[in-house]
Amino acid sequence: EAVRWLNSNAEGFVDALLVDPSSAIENLANTTGFVYLTGGSDGAAVTADWQTCFDAMQLIDVQFVAPISASPAVHSMADTHCQFMSDVMRMERRCIVGTDVSTTDDDAIAAALALNSDRCSLVHLGFYDYDSTGVLVLRPPYIMAGLLAGMFSGVNPGTALTNKSINVNGLERSLRNPVDTDRLINGGVLAVESTRTGYRVVKSITTWLTNSNYNRVEVSVGFAADFVSRSVRDALDPLRGMKANAETLSEAEIRVTSALGVLALSEPYGPGVLAGDADNPAYRNIYVSIDGDVLRVEFECSPVIPINYIPIVVFAAPYSSTS
């Protein structure tokens, strides 16, 4: 009965057979032990392969991309992909790239200068980790880039990786903080360091060097701004196809205000993407207009900015007392 049921519902994928239990049943040739494929090769990815990959990713909505390559050409392609997807395709994203092992600080700064992008970060230190055989091996910086991209993907938008711990078993080499790290930060390199309490990100920045705007330099601030754009766009999307009249104009303003209000809620009540208070609102100056078949929305908002520096001033005073 079981055999008939399997055959009737298998749709050609299963062919069950009832075997006489009194007959000897031998194992199939490929089940007597583990058999591994042999021959063949992984091959080497060329530029055209990477372009095919980035073209395929135009159909996928992701927020972070980390190409597993040390090639500056691939890094440039990744940045171009992120710029296009963010500005044209309305699927904002960012990339983190890494150089090869033994990259000097000077070479890393030169590579960051060549990119100079607000949507691309660059790391130049590899890390030690155990391979599948239990041997401690050095992973190249572009693997570190993938690790950091995964970390960014696992936190709320607006959360910086600055001072966050990295789960590795050592860094390729040590940096002096602030002698080496400040120079790297000023050069647009996302630096990692070894501290007394573990391995940490010094400052999660992009390779942007044109100015010091937070939404351009800080990955977390730019990510927060991207999330604001996505949220407001999603809130307004149901209005596409509706009548261009005063009622729709009013509803658009309500939808924008509501979406921004949610984004301004601090954690754990909301995402905490926007920062503000009663005297300094998280968003303001909402302007909605209709011109022909175009509904235009403009507003000002304050994406949350990470604390990167904590100066401490100590005033020493002599002790005096009377009795």
Regions found by a protein language model. Name each.
Residues 284-323:
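C-terminal edge-of-domain segments
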Residues 70, 261, 304:
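Residue-level marker of positions within ordered structural domains that often coincide
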Residues 248-277:
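Short, hydrophobic/π-rich interface segment
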Residues 267-294:
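Long, charged, glycine-rich C-terminal linkers/tails
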Residues 1-243, 264, 271-277:
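A glycine- and small-residue-enriched flexible loop/hinge signal that marks low-structured segments
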